[in-house]
Amino acid sequence: MCFALNISFEKLFLRLNDELSNEQKDEYLKLCERLSLGEPFEYISGVCEFLGREFMVNSSVLIPRIETEILVQKCLKIIKRQNFKNIIDIGTGSGIIAISLALSLPNANILATDLSLKALQTAKENAKKFGVKNISFLQSDLLENFNQNADIIISNPPYIARDYPLSISVLNEPSLGLFGGIKGDEILINLIKQAKNRCKYLACEIGYDQKASMQTALKNAGFKARFYKDLAGFTRGFIAHIENFKLKIS
């Protein structure tokens, strides 16, 4: 209702007894119909909050989730502790990871990549909105289209299994950003293999049931990993480093 009337919740509360005009009723009913058909509200409104900031979103990018905030916060701690300067964000989507990092790390050099040109355009628009200057954007399938290395590679890649049951609302999001293959972990495993000689650290969000396959893939690639949980207590990601890279203890 607030969105349909273009007013704040506080103003809506003060106008509870006001009668809607026919135009306002029509707008509200159209909004309800779109929601009933499974269109995410974030696509209707065109915005979504992430780490306290309002990012532009549309049907070409995934809707940011709170789980990814955990990934960004953990990476920020590592980057600051290790004084890393070169960062790569794989599958940037709307740019939430790269931009959130750039705003906290103005001296870092960040490369944000995505396979989707439409997603990259959205990320560029968000970077412009926040006045971020230290991000470059590139179309790439994982690490295949460039040779640049990084101190840390960060990714929230597609990791859902092809046959996993999803709500209509989620199915309205781009499949390119949702599904990681038949099992769901194929893209993650491929990324780990590609990152082996390209970074000191690799940090990824993963599916709740993918810890075992990630442990195997990371070990085979020479990474030593720590896994972390989301707010619901499920395994949700890992922070890995090449074993011969010396950690700085804070």
Predicted regions located by residue number:
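Conserved AdoMet
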Residues: 2-77
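Short loop/edge segments at beta-strand edges and connector loops
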Residues: 45, 139-140, 206, 229
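Generic structural signal for residues in well-ordered beta-strands
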Residues: 55, 135-137, 225
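Conserved SAM/SAH cofactor-binding pocket of Class I
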Residues: 67-163
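Mobile active-site "lid"/loop adjacent to the S-adenosyl-L-methionine
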Residues: 159-187
